Every structure is written in structure tokens, then in C-alpha cells.
Amino acid sequence: MDYVSIEAAQATTGLTLVVNAGVPGPWSESAKALFRHHQIPFLAVPQIPATANEDLLAWTGHRNAPIAIYPSEPPRTRALELLELAERLGLGASLMPKKRAGRIQVTGWVQEIAGERGFGWCARYLIFNQWASQMSDAARAANPMFSAYGYDESSQARMLERAQSFLSDLALAIKA
């Protein structure tokens, strides 16, 4: 992927997408696929995982990826915000059903998969536990990801239960 500087992105009249650099993070990969599906060109700005990303924070108010920045609009970081922006700006087939009941289902599943405390959040938390077990206390304290996501070793059982419960519910929904 070709990345541009923050300065170049600030000068654009189109969409800028801040995405993980060097690691195929699931949220960034999903955001890129979403905007590509809707045929929306974007400039990519790199976000360096597990670092403070102070330049991004100063520009957007966020240090994580993905971040969608469209001129004269606030930065968007949540999955449903990205989906709504892509639907509004893009071309091609909509990912949203025309009927309200279907849209409610889609937005609910998006939130349950990619939203705060959703399946992806829980899975990341479980990965953090393995990662944390290989780090010193000082290294963990220096890594902004652990504090940003409220990592707490005692929450592992609850996160595992939430992830398993989601997968059970998803299996039931697919069978229905």
C-alpha cells in the first residue's frame, strides 16, 4: 500500500483513510474493503500499531486505526460510522437492505462484530492476554494499547464467554 504524509492528506479534497501500517489489522482491512467496494478512492495515512501516534492524535483526536477523514466533516472511527459514510459517498451495490427490518439486523450484527465490547473487541482482549504474559510489567505499562482498551487480566474469562456466546448466536442466525 502506498502511504502519504499527514500533510499531504490534509491538503486533499477527497477521502483519507488512516490504516494500520505493517500489520493487516482486521478493522483497517475491513475499512479498506468497504471503501473499495463502494468505489471510493482514498489516500492512505499510516498508523503505527502499539505506538502513541501523537501526530495522528493531534490531527484527528484519535491514535488508532481506521480513521476516515472527509473534508469539512468530523473524523469517523466506529464501524457503523464508516459504513454510513461509504454508503453516502459511494457507488455500486449498497451493503444495507432497503427494508428497515433488514437494516436493523445488519447494523446490529456490525455492532456485535466490530463495535466496542463486540466479538472483535473480545478476541483482541484474549490476544492481549497471551501477549501480556510474554511482557514485563514495564513493557506492558509503556504500550498504549493496554490502557486504551482497558486491559485487565482478570477479565479473560468474561471476554472468552462473550466471544463464545457471540459465535453461538451467529451460528443460530446462519441456520435460521
Question: What are these model-derived regions, one by one?
Answer:
Residues A148-A176:
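A mid-sequence, solvent-exposed acidic-amphipathic segment
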Residues M1-F146:
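GST-like domain detector, emphasizing the conserved glutathione-binding G-site
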